[in-house]
Amino acid sequence: MGSDERKPLLSINDGDDDFNHQDVSTKTPPIKKESLSNKFKSFLKKSMTKETLPILIYVLLYIISGVINVVLLKKLMIKFVNYGFFLSQITNYGYLPIFLVAMWYKMYCTSDVPKETRNFPQYKFVIMGLLDAINGFFVVIGGVSTSGPLQQLLNQAIIPFTMIASFIFLRERYSLFQLGGAAVILGGVIVSLIPSLVGGSSGGNILFYNFFYLISVIPGALSNVYKDIAFQSIDMDVWYLQFWDCLYQSLFGSILFPVNNWLPPPATIKFTEIIPSMRDGALCLGGKNTILPIFNGTTSTLAFGSCGINDNFVCDDCHNTWIIVLIYMTVNIAYNIFILLVLKHAGATVYSIANTVILPLTNIFFSIHFIMGAATTPFSALSVAGLLLILFGLGGYRIGSMIKKPPPDSKKDSEQQGGEGGAGDGDSSDNKNNLGDSAEIPQQIQPKTQLHLRNQFFGRLGIDIPESRYRATNIINN
């Protein structure tokens, strides 16, 4: 046996050293795994296109303006704690000049307000303004003695109440996901109210006014449903609608002052005190305190009957109130503009997700002492539990809304159309067969119906549209 034969198999040299060397040297180096930071950067580069970047900016600005809007409104309620009725008038009449100028421009400088819109029955605006006035009255008067986090949780009750109103007046039907989500939302609202039910007045909450605030969702839900009924067959300009709604809302809001005569403190206003209360509210708007503490001359303690002794009679703190009012009105207008932009460019699904994000963010801001000062509301176990339940219920409701099922009525209509066309469409089916199996008749694009355009319009306004009605118009258009 030669020396080569005694070598191990892998050591045999057949003169291919150059080949083996070349083969080893040309092997592909091992692929390095991309780091998470690089993956994130590449994802951002692919996502940040000219189309998606504006949408992301709109959504972020909507969330930011929404949080600021809620926080500023609560700070205004704290400033006007003794003048809740005056605050409700400011939040109504303050927007009238803005909407009037915008409507005038739309009517006389553009063609956005046609004759059909101008001839729209005024009584429908009156009913809508009445419902919105009652809603705003309950929100402001009840919100003065309801903490910021609890306000945001109670606001979510409008979803189940709107479902009930839609079921009664529109005969709307809902899926099990939507019904389950609404039930969980109501459970979260009840859990959030437990501290007030058990502990009475605490954390700036007064039980009576917590329920007073909660009642506001009833006229709010009725307003949503009425808007769906009243604007059944017309596409209306946003600014035109906002002006008339704001006008009638302000007028009806002004005549609601007798209700304060029977309300407990701090919202009590006797009939003879309405004018002095409005005057003192105007002074508070200018930064002047009217209700001041009274001290004992000898002990330097608060005298009997002075403000500040209990939560039902609070001293004025009107410093820089007018600045907060101006900032709030500016942010509120921007907030409503971003609502339209998000709905227009991102759609209702992204809008719903953004609303869900706003809810926990506002509760976080209400717990920061630097922002809320003495009105800071720390987290509690029950408030966190209520928040989680409501978020879970909102998720279930949104999932149920996104599940598209053809409504039974549209299915029956299509079956009836097929049945009616069974005898009369024989010629058309024969003609189609004569063209051959491979021939296809081009599908014509059907024009959008007035109902479909109206639903799009209200979606941009942020008005809830029953899912089956919106899907029905899509089925007709498709």
Curated annotation (Swiss-Prot):
Fetch the Pfam families from UniProt.
Answer: CRT-like (PF08627)
Q: Where is the composition biased (Basic and acidic residues)?
A: 406-415
Which keywords accompany this UniProt record? Answer: Amino-acid transport, Glycoprotein, Membrane, Transmembrane, Transmembrane helix, Transport, Vacuole
Q: Which residues are glycosylated?
A: N296
| Coiled coil spans | none
Side of membrane Cytoplasmic, spans = 1-52, 105-124, 171-178, 227-237, 344-352, 398-478
Topology relative to the lipid bilayer, per the entry, is: Multi-pass membrane protein
Q: Which GO terms describe its biological process?
A: amino acid transport
Subcellular locations according to the entry: Vacuole membrane
Question: Which InterPro entries does the record cross-reference, listed alphabetically?
Answer: CRT-like, Transprt_Chloroquine
State which ranges are Vacuolar (membrane side). Answer: 74-83, 146-149, 200-205, 259-322, 374-376
Q: What is its main location?
A: membrane
Q: Which GO terms describe its cellular component?
A: vacuolar membrane
Q: Which GO terms describe its molecular function?
A: xenobiotic transmembrane transporter activity
Q: Where is this region: Disordered?
A: 1-30, 404-446
Transmembrane parts of this sequence? 53-73, 84-104, 125-145, 150-170, 179-199, 206-226, 238-258, 323-343, 353-373, 377-397
Q: Which PANTHER family does this UniProt record tie to the protein?
A: PROTEIN CLT2, CHLOROPLASTIC
What is the stated purpose of this protein? Nutrient transporter. Involved in maintaining the osmotic homeostasis of the digestive vacuole.
Write out the similarity annotation. Answer: Belongs to the CRT-like transporter family.
The protein depicted here goes by the name Crt homolog 3
Can you name the source organism?
Dictyostelium discoideum
Q: Which gene is the coding source of this polypeptide chain?
A: crtp3
